[in-house]
């Protein structure tokens, strides 16, 4: 890969990991438009590391408080808000882990097509618009319940379908349950930590078994640009989402889906 390709792909990973706009669709475009080949397992690991570091550093205070609270109070009857939130992240992650483990091979073989990605980009974009337009959006993250965390975790399973957008579907579920936009985004980003970590570990295991040649400079640049773009994305999204709402992202998803459909049927 050239340095230009590394930078573009790393930025795509960093931004689309957290915005509700589907990473699958964006990673498909360079291949369709420019004929870029697959970036390889090592690069995939590197950009996941960059995204993971970004979200963990941004939420370092919350993660520290949740970890301490969970270790000291996790199995007691009296639990603080931080301890409960830690449990909710764990509970919300379990459905995607189980279904992902069972269905990963089938999904990769049958669902990772341009037509599927285009369809899910449009359909779940419209669902995001409906949730944002009709939901009450009154509840803070501190008021999240176990039942709500389970529902959001079950919704996250749909993100295994390429084009859905993990952040998009979890925010959609949160909005439908009455959470404020920023609360939906914060819980979605916290849920991303074990998901990105798991995806990175799986890619690492695949890399070790593949015995693939490693370009360390490409990995360093990939991780760095993924980190910077992801961190800025998280910061700006949380700063603006309460004011701008989800409509700009919905419009963008519809446009992206239309472009992908054009590639399919052209």
From Swiss-Prot:
Catalytic activity: di-trans,octa-cis-undecaprenyl diphosphate + H2O = di-trans,octa-cis-undecaprenyl phosphate + phosphate + H(+)
Predominant location category: membrane
Compartment(s): Cell inner membrane
InterPro entries: UppP (IPR003824)
Disulfide bonds: none
Example GO molecular function: undecaprenyl-diphosphatase activity
A GO term from the CC aspect: plasma membrane
Transmembrane segments: 1-21, 39-59, 87-107, 113-133, 143-163, 187-207, 218-238, 244-264
Pfam families: BacA (PF02673)
E.C. numbers: 3.6.1.27
One GO-annotated biological process of the protein: peptidoglycan biosynthetic process
PANTHER family reported in the protein's UniProt record: UNDECAPRENYL-DIPHOSPHATASE
Family stated for the protein in its record: Belongs to the UppP family.
Role played: Catalyzes the dephosphorylation of undecaprenyl diphosphate (UPP). Confers resistance to bacitracin.
Miscellaneous comment text of the record: Bacitracin is thought to be involved in the inhibition of peptidoglycan synthesis by sequestering undecaprenyl diphosphate, thereby reducing the pool of lipid carrier available.
Alphabetized HAMAP family for the sequence: Undec_diphosphatase
Protein name in UniProt: Undecaprenyl-diphosphatase
Classification lineage: Bacteria, Pseudomonadati, Pseudomonadota, Gammaproteobacteria, Alteromonadales
